[in-house]
A protein has these predicted regions:
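Intrinsically disordered, low-complexity regions of eukaryotic proteins
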Residues: 4, 18, 22-25, 35, ...
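Accessory, solvent-exposed terminal regions and/or long lumenal/extracellular loops of proteins
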Residues: 290-354
Length: 354
């Protein structure tokens, strides 16, 4: 590890932070026992304290400091403009500067389940802009796994297909048998962006939580507290992802009544009302299970090839009216470039009441 590289990462955050950085890094250095290469870990130099610091004692402080340095630099270079910044290595508090992805996972069904289970945890640490390597990073994926992972990944803020060198090429266009379904899932991602972006901003501005376990909303329900493979997405949606090979459906627990939408595309779906309780729900390989809670609605835009071309008018609504026939959604929109998230003009109420 090059010592100047580390010094740049930790201390390039501006002179006003130099004293804090020196104290923080000095505290890490004080824990170091010995110098030089120990266990194959390279030594790095703290020029301010004149001590050598092993990288295994710095760990995520290194990546977190790089994120901070880059975030503050972009803020100086592009004042008032947004920057897309995310890292693999980070520390608590780095969400103020950028997001993270979940690191080197493996192309397996077990890792898809782990991806589902990790999302609430990492977001409770403050990281909203996050996601896993879709299809898996290490090992060879399969067409079915690629499709099922995308069917969950299309709901994550960071949606990215990423693989290691030497593994099977896994760009979606390479899976000819699943290509029509993969294409529709990508289009569905864009159609759902009005909902996904609105819930992302609500979580950032109002601390509502983008992904949550069921027990957060039904804390008195012991069965809801035990569910580990279903997620709440914002205020109005529950997800029950498919994560088992060759499965034609799955068991789902509903703490309350919900409207199930079985989505094959943004335009092709069927729906049914389900009461609270345990259900076995069929789900074909090209389908996504989306449950809407009473009184809520999910806006769908016309799919586009990029966000700049996304047309939010007209908007369809996937609704679940409450006992009074009421369903609505509070949608957030902005220009996608400037930094003014709390302007009142960003909010629109969409009514789907009967």
């Amino acid at each position: 590890m090059d010592r100047n590289f580390l010094r740049l990462a930790v201390f390039a955050t501006g002179p006003e932070h130099a004293a804090d950085d020196a104290e923080l890094f000095g505290a890490v250095a004080a824990q170091v026992e010995g110098h030089g290469r120990i266990g194959g870990v390279g030594a790095v130099q703290d020029d301010l304290a004149g001590q050598q610091v092993r990288h295994d004692r710095v760990h995520n402080l290194y990546g977190g400091s790089m994120t901070r340095a880059a975030g503050e630099a972009f803020a100086d270079l592009r004042p008032g403009r947004r920057t897309l910044l995310y890292s693999r290595s980070s520390i608590i508090g780095s969400h103020r500067y950028g997001g993270i992805w979940l690191g080197d996972n493996h192309s397996s069904w077990e890792q898809l389940l782990a991806n589902i289970q990790m999302m609430p945890s990492v977001q409770m640490c403050g990281f909203l802009y996050t996601g896993a390597d879709l299809c898996g990073f290490a090992g060879d994926t399969t067409p079915d796994l690629a499709l099922r992972w995308l069917e969950f990944g299309l709901f994550t803020p960071l949606m990215r297909n990423h693989a290691a060198a030497g593994t099977r090429e896994q760009e979606y266009f390479r899976f000819a048998d699943q290509l029509p379904a993969l294409r529709e899932m990508l289009r569905l991602r864009y159609a759902l962006l009005p909902y996904l972006y609105s819930e992302f901003m609500k979580s950032a501005l109002e601390n509502t939580g983008y992904f949550r376990p069921l027990g957060f909303d039904w804390p008195a329900d012991p069965e809801a507290r035990e569910v580990q493979d279903q997620l709440l997405l914002g205020d109005g949606v529950m997800l029950a992802p498919m994560y088992t090979q060759n499965a034609a459906g799955r068991h789902v627990y509903l703490p309350g009544p919900m409207q199930l939408y079985r989505l094959r595309s943004a335009e092709d779906y069927d729906t049914e009302a389900l009461p609270a309780g345990h259900h076995y729900v069929h789900c074909a390989l090209n389908e996504v299970l989306l449950f809407v809670r009473p009184g809520h609605a999910v806006p769908l835009a016309k799919p586009a090839a990029c966000t700049a071309a996304l047309d939010e008018q007209p908007i369809a609504l996937l609704a679940c009216p409450d006992a009074d026939g009421h369903a609505a959604y509070r949608m957030y929109t902005d220009d996608g470039e400037t930094m003014d998230p709390e302007h009142d003009g960003h909010w629109t109420v969409l009514d789907a009441s009967h």
